[in-house]
A protein has these predicted regions:
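Extended, folded cores of ATP/NTP-driven motor/assembly subunits in large transport
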Residues: 2-372, 378, 393, 400-401
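N-terminal pre-P-loop "Q-motif" helix
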Residues: 382-390, 396-397
């Protein structure tokens, strides 16, 4: 009986039970969230930009700032079962062609399209006829990996203003090497807007660095050293404060700068689909290598994680599921990774817009909608601008003049 009570009141036993229950709860949450996402009506938009596009990465940053408007306030979240919508910005090489996509819940389609057009007026947007991620025919090898941050998310990665050459060129250059093969590479950058509360975590990190405390990931060895230090008498004055090094001063400055912009929770997924496992590993290694161009010795950077050959995990790509918190990037960092190509990107095989489009002339008699009717206009043609059909023709009163 004594042994039973000793086990019953052992804190390690209860800690283990709590940990197991927490894990099971988390797994259940994942399943519920996954079902919610998979049951959401979504749309995949293909974006084509003219090769003469002169909009820089700054346009993408402004786009992300406006798209941040999908952020729900606490009341809206409560009414929406706590679900905050996210977007997926994608670059894909299929059949040797490099395409740019944006995925979203269908309820956001009109808003997202409008924001894209506002920053890229010459872009052509089409609803994809089929989702590339659903076509796995004859793909025997599927190699998947994720991109994660090396350091604390308070520290920024290298951004586009620090590059002499557009960083997108390095990414698309790797995809272009698939030319002439049936292999595929998918890049999905999932982004969910977050409230400015994340700045508080950044401020806490800055305070720890300024005070000389450890501000990064803590492991068990570090905890043991802390416990050991508690039993060790102090050698100096309790009020002695260590001055931050020049390196820490730079990191503090950059972290504070990062926190001045809007933020997104981000998850980056990479997939290679082909026939040969060795080739798959080499291609993913090359692709993850291009993300290291955003690495900085004193600041933050990217590394590969969660690599897998498990085909079942491709479902996460197909559903664009985003169930955890990912890591935080601000709009400048996110725009450095994903933006529409411009004149400085000379990568072959990018699918550019074949022709420019413009809205109908202001004096042209038009009827908006392909089935609409206007008794004052004799319609004889149909045009499409930004996904909206317009009938055009001649005013009936002018017919007698011709």
């Amino acid at each position: 009986m004594t042994a039973f009570f000793s086990i019953l009141f052992n804190p390690l036993v209860w800690l283990t039970i709590v940990a197991i229950l927490a894990f099971l709860t988390w797994q259940n949450y994942k399943k519920i969230d996954k079902l919610t996402v998979m049951n959401t009506d979504s749309v995949l938009l293909a974006l084509e930009i003219p090769k003469t596009n002169d909009k820089s990465e700054l346009a993408a940053e402004q786009l992300l700032a406006s798209l941040h408007g999908i952020l729900r306030d606490p009341t809206e979240l409560k009414n929406n079962n706590g679900v905050q919508e996210h977007l997926s910005f994608e670059i894909v090489s299929v059949n040797g062609a490099i395409r740019f996509y944006v995925w979203m819940p269908r309820t956001l389609q009109s808003f997202v399209e409008g924001q894209i057009y506002s920053q890229y007026p010459t872009v052509q947007i089409y609803e994809a006829k089929e989702d590339y991620a659903e076509n796995l025919e004859n793909k025997h090898v599927v190699y998947l990996t994720e991109i994660d941050l090396i350091e604390n998310e308070a520290l920024p990665i290298k951004t586009f203003d620090g590059f002499e050459v557009d960083p997108l060129a390095g990414i698309t250059g790797t995809l272009a090497k698939l030319d002439g093969t049936n292999d595929q590479i998918w890049i999905q950058v999932l982004a969910r807007p977050v409230a400015d509360d994340w700045h508080k975590k950044s401020d806490e990190w800055v305070k720890k660095v300024k005070s000389g405390k450890k501000a990064f990931k803590i492991d068990w060895k570090y905890i043991l050293r802390i416990l050991e230090a508690l039993w060790t008498p102090p050698e100096g004055s309790e009020n002695a404060k260590k001055e931050p090094s020049d390196r820490d001063k730079t990191r503090i400055s950059k972290a504070e700068e990062k926190a001045t912009k809007l933020g997104y929770q981000v998850k980056i997924r990479l997939a290679y689909l082909g026939e040969d496992e060795d080739t798959a590993r080499l291609q993913i290694q090359a692709l993850t290598g291009t993300f290291k161009q955003f690495n900085s010795t004193n600041l933050n950077g990217f590394k590969a994680s969660n690599s897998s050959l498990d085909k079942d995990k491709i479902r996460d790509f197909q559903s664009r599921i985003f169930f955890d918190d990912g890591f935080i990037l601000n709009i400048q960092e996110l725009a450095s990774i994903w933006h529409l190509p411009h004149t400085n990107v000379e990568t072959p095989n990018i699918v550019w817009a074949s022709s420019k489009t413009a809205e109908p002339p202001s004096k042209l008699p038009i009827i908006t909608g392909d089935r609409a009717h206007d008794e004052n206009i004799s319609a004889f043609g149909l045009t499409n601008f930004r996904g909206i059909n317009h009938q055009f023709g001649m005013l009936r009163r002018d017919r007698s003049r011709h």
